[in-house]
Amino acid sequence: MEPGVSIESGSAIRVAVLPVGGPISPARLRDYAALVARHARVDLASLRPYYSEHQKSPFAHQPWGGGCLRLKFVLGGCVPSPWEDFQSSRKVLAVVGICHLPSSPDLGRVAADFVDAARSYPSALASRCFAFCPTDAQLVQKKRDNIIMFPPSDQQSLELHMLTMIQDLSASLLMEFEKWVLRAESTGTILKTPLDSQSSLGSEEVIKAKKRRLGRAQKIIGDYCLLAGSPADANAHYATAIELARLTGDVFWHAGALEGSVCALVVDRMAESDPVLEDEVKFRYYTIIQLYRRATLQDNAQRVSPVSFELEAALKLARYLCRRQCAKEVSDLLMGAADGAKALIDASDRLILYIEIARLFGTLGYKRKAAFFSRQVAQLYLQQDNAYAAMSAMQVLTTTTTAYHVQSRKTSKMDHGLLKSVVSLFESQWSTLQMVVLREILMSSIRAADPLSSWSAAARLLRSFYPLITPAGQSGLASSLSNSADKLPSGTRCADPCLPFIRLHSFPLHPSQREIVKRNPNKKEWWTGGGPSGPFIYTPFTKGGTSGTSKQEVNWIVGEPVQVMVELANPCSFDLIVESIYLSVHSGNFDAFPVSVNLPPNTSKLVLLSGIPTQVGQVSIPGCIVHCFGVITEHLFKEVDCLLLGAAQGLVLSDPFRCCGSSKFKSVNFPSISVVPPLPLLVANVVGGDGSILLYEGEIRDVLITLTNAGTVPVEEANVALSGKNQDSVISIAHSTWKSALPIKPGGEVTFAVTLRAWHLSPTDLEADGSRSPANSRRIAREGSNPFLDIHYAGPSGNSESNDVSLPPGRRLVVPLNICVVQGMRLVRARLLSMELPARFTDAHLRSVSSKDNLSNGSDAIRNDISLLKIDPYKGSWDLRLLELELFNPTDVVFDVDVSVHLDGTSVEQKILPEDKTASSACHKTRIDRDYSARVLIPLEHFKLPVLDTSFFVKENGSDEPLGSRAATLAEKNAKAELNASINNLISKIKVKWHSGRNSSGELNIKDAIQTALQASIMDILLPDPLTFSFRHAKDGTTAKTDSSKEPGDGSSRSADESVLRCKDPIFANEMTHMEVQIRNNTKETIRMNLSISCKDVAGENCFDENSATVLWAGVLSDIYLEVQPLQEVVHPFSIYFLVPGDYSLQAASVIIDATDVLRARAKAESPDEPILCRGSPFHIHVVGTA
């Protein structure tokens, strides 16, 4: 069998092209051969100048106008075929020698070599030797026969010269064909095939051979007519041969003649596309196949079988019909030919058959069938034990890799912008077959001594099918990779990656890369309005943007290092040593830094790959360059993304990252990376350390911040602003300091101060700590609660003369002020106390307290201080309410606590009553050591409202009230607002401040605690009594003068102030003492009442008892009817006479007649008939005896 056969093959003249003379390089030989083969078709009309008709031509229907000769050049020649007499197209009818004269200076030797080479082809009818590039000396030598020199010239001249010589050769062949045909017609010829020479012929076979000789001669004459370009003459001879072969029963030659007639028919109508012609060709060729099959059955006893001609006929018809419309018919023909391969004795015939079947299936588009028969070809090549056969097997197997989707990357240029279908790239059901193909490529490449191909095959096998390979097999492939790499030069690159698997993990941008701000040339304050509210401008791996198609943008700066995080996985059972890995950048404006990585078996690792942008422009990073197993390969991120997507859909064998314990596949969008010109780079440093700034609540401190320009461009402009939470904790920023330092040159720095004040912690921060352990409760710092310094800065604006209005971008530096607010003093609890027992204070105590702060104010100041104390050393604190605050110091420092109450715009410091009552005198400050507590008492008597109003008792739910006057409703609302304002005023007047060390001070937030403590008793504290009683001592019947600075309506203040009897005004026994009781109406309505005055001794006995009276009196002391106008006072005088010295107390009480609802609500009466009794505080009197 012969390769590349077709129906038209019978019309091609076989010409052997042989190199002769000295050695010729393969490249030069290919160039010379291509120059010859370019003229494979020679028109008959062009042969007229070289053709001479010696006698009448046997080709009566020669188409000189449109016919042509077809030449088939065979480089290197071919072995003579035993079937040359059966098909003349198998003969080598011409020999062309190619000589490179610079390597063959002796023309005689060249001529001799050519004669010797041409002698190997006795069937050759013409010969020429083309000698190229002769020297001047060779050109002047005597010309030799059949040696044609081609002087050096341009390509066009060489082609024209060659065309002339090929035309001359073709004309010689045509004249030789005429001679051969004329001789064969006159004298006949003896034609033999291997079928005729197998055994000695008997008498019957001799007679049969003589009958068949004429028909065979007509068939051969038809072949020569076809070779001479006269299909009409050939068809006439073929028709005669067909009839004679049919009559003589020469089945084999009958099939040959019929096949020649089809060739003549097709060649004659080459330019036509006729369905009738196609049907005729198919009908005749099916007949030819049947005839060859009959001839095979007749000659099955012969050692040489003509089955190859049957298979060739099937291949010729399949090639003629090879198109999509006839796919089924062509496939049936090819599969039938494949079945007949078993009958072929010669292995080379089977090889050619499988090659042709694979080619035709590939032309038809049946890639898988073509790959299957290509593998059969490779198997036949591998049966031969030589390197050339192994190379052929490797090349054939390489053609099948596309069909099995295991092709090398170098054979398929991938488009990095478009992802191929996962289904077409990965088909797990082919895994076993794909492994077999790659293993065959690996074996053939090793036998062919091609280390790069063997490395590529082993890499694809290990990378794609590691889950199906045993650990021993994986180690064997690793050894094969290392052995192949040892035979390759250092730095060899391969298009097919091996291990590890690499996927893009993230872009961990440095803050200097995140904070890039575009500058608007039309806006002076370019930093306003364009930035986000938080400290981060760009977060690469979050779902951002309202448009799903918008691509994220990342700006890199020339000369500043950047990082890309990738994840490496080694799913195999051996240690993987990656000699170097770095980013693959195709844009050429990036310098990548290599790193080495060691991956243990079945592990993955995150690796940071870095580099420096070198030029302005776009940066493209499709993957990584890896130097592993001695070869450099490129690993593309998108290939691994396709692999992981296929694993997620179950289309590929395994996910290498999940096998190594990595997280689930997460697709990472590759951002658009732009490189901008060099920018300044400010680095902030908080003097004293970058940790948290520890501040107690309310503490004020200056923090120094240093800015250093670490870039290569000066800072021309800058702006410092505040962002984040608790911005009011920044009191001031020294703007003038850093502004005066502009411009900040590269390497320069500036230091400025920021004044901070710690804020008060929220209730959520002050959760109760049952253990009270300082380690558990002292440090409270919440993320996101700190303020930030937003520093926008930029370098020079560039060339002002340039027409480009765009400015280099600016930068944003975020300096977090990590303030850790610590609770300096803890308010454990607050509660309201009612003091109903006398609080005894010595006279010296009162004098020491009053003189400590107000020594220069005289006696009036002393009286004011005593009144503010709200405690009578003699009569106690009958109606006094004390607010107790329990404080705890959980820190490791000492605190001094001050309590102050602000009255009428002045701050009056309150004295602290420590829990230890043994103190001899009160102190302004209370010192609380570590892990100690103290209690602070705050009197609340001076906070009562001046008037008891009806509106204070209006129900909050007004739905029950009828629609009344809008003015009344407004008054009620105003009264409620006044009550709420009074409550808030009461709370705001109490201040608890602390001091610690030299500069640390603050204020304790007690508002909520006080409000909770006063929740139940706020009405009793704020609202005054309906009636206020006070006693006066009158000398000689006249009332003692009081402090004229008192307000007339401030009854509570007057009673409190004047109820204290001074030691300088003693009362003596056995003397008449004149007294007055003052009653004040604190309501807006007239009150009628019955007043009674009682006197008791220290035993609580009534001193006015008629039976055992110890005190005598003058005046009315019981059932005294009085009527007091709204907000007015009445005075009732009386006199008393003490018989026995001692301590006595006077007390006034009144029963209100016809009490109103307001009075009943204030008294919290349970029934409307219940009497309303108002009682005043006891008035203590100390009576001394007479000397």
UniProtKB/Swiss-Prot annotation:
<dbReference type="Pfam" id="PF08626">
    <property type="entry name" value="TRAPPC9-Trs120"/>
</dbReference>
<protein>
    <recommendedName>
        <fullName>Trafficking protein particle complex II-specific subunit 120 homolog</fullName>
    </recommendedName>
</protein>
<dbReference type="InterPro" id="IPR013935">
    <property type="entry name" value="TRAPP_II_complex_Trs120"/>
</dbReference>
<keyword id="KW-0333">Golgi apparatus</keyword>
<comment type="function">
    <text>Specific subunit of the TRAPP II complex, a highly conserved vesicle tethering complex that is required for the proper transport of proteins in post-Golgi trafficking pathways to the growing cell plate in mitotic active cells.</text>
</comment>
<keyword id="KW-0813">Transport</keyword>
<dbReference type="GO" id="GO:0005802">
    <property type="term" value="C:trans-Golgi network"/>
</dbReference>
<dbReference type="GO" id="GO:0000919">
    <property type="term" value="P:cell plate assembly"/>
</dbReference>
<dbReference type="GO" id="GO:0005769">
    <property type="term" value="C:early endosome"/>
</dbReference>
<comment type="subunit">
    <text>Part of the multisubunit TRAPP (transport protein particle) II complex composed of BET3, BET5, TRS20, TRS23, TRS31, TRS33, TRS65, TRS85, TRS120 and TRS130.</text>
</comment>
<comment type="similarity">
    <text>Belongs to the TRS120 family.</text>
</comment>
<keyword id="KW-0967">Endosome</keyword>
<feature type="region of interest" description="Disordered">
    <location>
        <begin position="1037"/>
        <end position="1059"/>
    </location>
</feature>
